[in-house]
Swiss-Prot record:
Protein name as annotated: tRNA (adenine(58)-N(1))-methyltransferase non-catalytic subunit TRM6
Chain segments carrying region Disordered: 1-34, 434-487
Function: Substrate-binding subunit of tRNA (adenine-N(1)-)-methyltransferase, which catalyzes the formation of N(1)-methyladenine at position 58 (m1A58) in initiator methionyl-tRNA.
Organism, scientific name: Yarrowia lipolytica (strain CLIB 122 / E 150) (Yeast)
Quaternary structure annotation from Swiss-Prot or TrEMBL: Heterotetramer; composed of two copies of TRM6 and two copies of TRM61.
Gene name, Swiss-Prot/TrEMBL: TRM6
Localisation: Nucleus
Length: 487
């Protein structure tokens, strides 16, 4: 019997192991990073002037990038992101090898270390130092046989004071000319950080002046992870929601609360996310449906016979209403059962009121993060959290990144940079225990401290009394000695 039982144990273990394997999801997490350029997707094009341009890669079309030229979309499809292309004559492209094709028109300009005694003291850099006129330079730009590197070579040769410049000055001069004359571009995949930079340059009000470092700090403070359920108030044109989807890797739920008929998530179209993924992860609810769920009209389920008898147009409308009503019921269940893993607010509405009215839907030990471009707003939210026993340890955060120049052995911060970036207030959702009265514990502690003080004072008094008789006794022999001496 024991042998039979021992033989059956591995079988049951294998069955359990097979059952565990089958319970795992078959499809891997969704990955947003596509290493190759795909057609009919949006792409961020980095120009030599350090500016960005968002373009849609439609096959068999030509994309113009301003003064830097134009190129055919078919020439870059299927190639990896990150390559730098140079536009040649007849709109042909050539891949630039970084580190090999850079600055080879000036021998020794790059790689030469700057000596400590080298200065620009004898340099007189005026407009007369350049022998080429603007008309001649514009004529060279119109010639299709000359590349941007050839134009820079002619400009350097026509500069009478270039050889007097230090290596550091030469490097900065070359970079300025590259930004002006090189016909190059670098396609980069769309992501939330690049999309945020694009909106900051285009219209920073659309993203509430949020910087990259503050977006990263917000995601870290909110503990955004795959499989989480988050209540989000997003008025950054959908950039915040896109960042959450990237961090969650296609697993979890994002409930976007809004004040209009539909939420403004226009930025999601630039990331080329599948529509099925957006419908599965993102659910929207307006404030009226959030605060008064009983006012929503119920859409009852119909029998297959009733559905078959409906017209195709009415059948589609019924399924849309029914699915929408079921989504609202699921969201209301999360609100009632405190099923959200975090509250993230980035809105122009009154954040203190939003936190006060939505905090009941957040689970225990879950983060509450509020972003605002103004310090006064987050200070008001912090004061509200300090008075509210449902939030523990609120704190205000600020993060700034400063760019540095690293050229030929020198490193110093950039002299110009944009301000702003916003502020965060972070707290932890807790459930206070109303039965515990901390005042009694504090009074007992005070009584205990007072008792210790009285005991210590009594012991000090006794020690002083014990010392006084000794001093009197020690003084008596001295008096006797004095009387003997007088005698």
């Amino acid at each position: 019997m024991k042998d039979a039982a021992q033989q059956q144990e591995p079988v049951s273990a294998r069955q359990t192991q097979v059952h565990r394997k089958s319970s795992k999801p078959e499809s891997p997490p969704f990955i947003f990073d596509n290493p190759r350029i795909q057609p009919n997707t949006y792409c961020m094009v980095k120009l030599p002037s350090e500016n960005f341009r968002v373009v849609k890669l439609i096959p068999n079309q030509t994309i113009s990038i301003g003064k830097f030229g134009s190129f055919q979309v078919n020439d870059i499809l299927g190639l990896p992101y990150g390559y730098t292309f140079e536009i040649q004559e007849d709109k042909r492209l050539r891949i630039i090898q970084e580190g090999v094709d850079d600055h080879d028109y000036v021998v020794g300009a790059k790689g030469a270390l700057l000596e400590p005694e080298e200065t620009n003291q004898t340099l007189i850099d005026t407009s007369e130092s350049q022998t080429l006129s603007m008309a001649e330079i514009e004529e060279m730009k119109k010639q299709k046989t000359l590349s941007g590197k050839d134009i820079i070579d002619h400009v350097i040769k026509g500069h009478n004071e270039f050889h007097k410049k230090t290596a550091f000055s030469k490097e900065k001069y070359l970079r300025r000319k590259e930004q002006k004359y090189l016909r190059r571009f670098t396609p980069q995949p769309m992501c939330s950080s690049l999309l945020l930079d694009f909106y900051l340059e285009k219209d920073y009000k659309k993203v509430l002046d949020m910087s990259q470092e503050m977006l990263a700090l917000l995601l870290s403070m909110a503990n955004v992870r795959p499989g989480g359920k988050y209540l989000v108030v997003d008025e950054t044109t959908g950039v915040l929601t896109a960042a959450l989807m990237e961090r969650m890797a296609g697993e979890g739920l994002i409930v976007v609360a809004h004040e209009n008929e539909h939420p403004n998530l226009d930025a999601l179209k630039y990331l080329s996310m599948p529509t099925e993924l957006q419908d599965r992860m993102i659910k929207s609810i307006n404030w009226l449906q959030f605060f008064e769920p009983e006012g929503e009209e119920e859409v009852p389920e119909k029998t297959p016979e009733q559905i078959a008898s409906m017209k195709p147009r009415n059948r589609g409308a019924y399924f849309r209403k029914r699915n929408r009503w079921l989504e609202l019921q699921n969201v209301n269940d999360l609100v009632a059962n405190q099923g959200f893993d975090g509250l993230i607010v980035a809105s122009t509405l009154h954040p203190a009121s939003i936190v006060d009215r939505t905090l009941h839907a957040i689970g225990g030990s879950r983060p509450v993060v509020v972003y605002s471009e103004y310090k006064e707003v987050v200070t008001e939210v912090s004061q509200l959290m300090l008075k509210d026993l449902r939030v523990l340890a609120p704190s205000i955060w600020e993060s700034r990144v400063r760019k540095y120049q690293t050229i030929l052995g020198r490193m110093h911060p950039s002299m110009t940079s944009r301000g702003g970036g916003g502020y965060l207030v972070h707290g932890t959702r807790v459930f206070p225990n109303e039965e515990v009265n901390a005042t009694q514990v504090r009074n007992r502690k005070r009584k205990r401290e007072d008792g210790d003080k009285t005991k210590s004072s009594e012991t000090e008094g006794k020690s002083e009394e014990s010392v006084e008789p000794d001093t009197e006794q020690s003084a008596e022999p001295e008096a006797k000695l004095e009387t003997d001496a007088d005698a």
